[in-house]
Amino acid sequence: MEELQDVQLTEIKPLLTDKGSGQHFEDFDGQEHNIETAFGVVHVTMSGNARGNRPVLLTFHDIGLNHKSCFNSFFNFDDMHEITQHFAVCHIDAPGQQEGAPSFPTGYQYPTMDELAEMLCAVLTHLNLRSIIGIGVGAGAYVLSRFALNNPLLVEGLVLINIDPCAKGWIDWAASKLSFWTSNIVEIVLGQLFGDEELQSNLDLVQTYRLHIAQDINQDNLQLFVTSYNSRKDLEIERPIFGSSTPTNTIKCPVLLVVGDSSPAVDAVVECNSRLDPTRTTLLKMADCGGLPQAVQPGKLTEAIKYFVQGMGYIPHVQLSHLSTESVPSASMTRLVRSRTHSASSSGSMEMPRSRSHTSNAQLQSTSNNSLSNQIQETPHTIELSC
């Protein structure tokens, strides 16, 4: 295994600091739409206008959350403005998950995860959006992945946080059914959002989301959404074989996979990484981070997304504000070429599409003084980043 080489990265405190309140999530300026689709009405919040041929940043949240609790604080984070000033932003709420949503009528058939992905086509058509860069968490990451598989020409890039590409096995399915009978929906969702360590140690954060899930999300609608997610199909993606002309079912756009090192989704994200094209995929594992990187490590995630989008050629090379005033940050991002059980299957690539990339393909020469930007934009071979 190659020697680890560190790149310094600023430590950022969590965005969520209120204690014991489920009503503190920041507002996000935007125009709300209720869009009719073949599978029901979807609530959308749109900020800014689509610009020419640029894609729109489109988000999709996890179970137990909505666009407000999953993304608003993150998108209002100062350094995210370095990104969002270049794009319109479209937040999707899964049916019935927005705040104040009424209960569905008795007998309502909630959309499957595949149908949720199909609903996005109607959203893009209604809002006259030509393409997207998707940012999804958990269930939302699955929906965006399915949408990218079905509509590759509409998706230019994906940031997938806590993605699980696999269907639940029979044992997991039975366990989830038993949980519905023996536990309340709030605790079930918390167990999927946070790891055991985080549930015990980060009490303020967990309590914030416990109150939000219990007070702000319609419980009946939430149970339908959770059931739909737990009944998902396997994405059936497979890693292309180098030199083979046999077509494979894989995501064709650049992908940034993100997971906290204590997230319950770590194994699932590594499995997803093993199935994706290594020349288009990057795996970012965040140290000291659980199931909500966008809330706990917004600075690191913002920086990674910025360089990911820069590699696609859409935004200029600008310095993030929190890095411009600190010469010796207290956290580090580590470059790690892995060789473990999954070997090449558990690695990703920082290489971006040649047609859009404005970066150098020179061999990475990393030192402790290099920036994360240099690692992302100059690396021509398969790596994992752990920060």
Swiss-Prot record:
Similarity annotation: Belongs to the NDRG family.
Region entry Disordered, spans: 329-387
Naturally occurring in which organism (per UniProt): Xenopus tropicalis
Biased composition range(s): Low complexity: 359-377
SUPFAM superfamilies tied to this protein: alpha/beta-Hydrolases
Protein name as annotated: Protein NDRG3
Lineage: superkingdom: Eukaryota
Coiled coil (residue ranges): none
